[in-house]
Amino acid sequence: MSDRIYLTRDGYNRLKEELHLLSTQTRKEVLEKIAEARSHGDLSENAEYDAAREEQSQLEAKIGDLENKLASATILDPKQIKTDRVYILTSVKLRNLDDEDEIIEYTLVSSEEADSDLGKISVRSPVGRALIGKSVGDKVTISVPKGELHYEILDIFVK
């Protein structure tokens, strides 16, 4: 069993749906590819068969990974999240101290739910790690590949 992971109800349901799709439809498609490749004869020199078996191996690993994540998941209730500090599932409004006009907002989530296009960043990302445990008014310096970012926490809230 892996480490405990924290998910929203939506995040848990998305993983569950993905697992269902992979273990039913996708698994069936891969088995059909294996059967088709097997029908071509000699398996010792059958690249199509080898590719299908490799795909099956990767699929089964992904299914196992999803099963482990779901088994070790704790579903968080946003109503129970405190906003005195930055925690998982809190949203944070930040002012860029290098460009006072830039205000950004992130929601800290587990790695499984991270989506930068939606402003959802992993608590394990450099930004997430720098923000966890901080309070309104705190200034943070975040090391990223392009250098350092400097922010002030303006607000902590739950969406």
UniProtKB/Swiss-Prot annotation:
SUPFAM superfamilies: FKBP-like, GreA transcript cleavage protein, N-terminal domain. It holds the Pfam family GreA_GreB_N. The keyword Phosphoprotein does not apply. Residues 43-76 form a coiled coil. It comes from the Bacteria. GO terms for biological process: DNA-templated transcription elongation; regulation of DNA-templated transcription elongation. Keywords: Coiled coil, DNA-binding, Transcription, Transcription regulation. GO terms for molecular function: DNA binding; RNA polymerase binding. InterPro entries: GreA/GreB_C_sf, TF_GreA/GreB_CS, Tscrpt_elong_fac_GreA, Tscrpt_elong_fac_GreA/B, Tscrpt_elong_fac_GreA/B_C, Tscrpt_elong_fac_GreA/B_fam, Tscrpt_elong_fac_GreA/B_N, Tscrpt_elong_fac_GreA/B_N_sf. Belongs to the GreA/GreB family. PANTHER family: TRANSCRIPTION ELONGATION FACTOR GREA. Necessary for efficient RNA polymerase transcription elongation past template-encoded arresting sites. The arresting sites in DNA have the property of trapping a certain fraction of elongating RNA polymerases that pass through, resulting in locked ternary complexes. Cleavage of the nascent transcript by cleavage factors such as GreA or GreB allows the resumption of elongation from the new 3'terminus. GreA releases sequences of 2 to 3 nucleotides. This is Transcription elongation factor GreA. It comes from Chlorobaculum parvum (strain DSM 263 / NCIMB 8327) (Chlorobium vibrioforme subsp. thiosulfatophilum). The gene is greA.
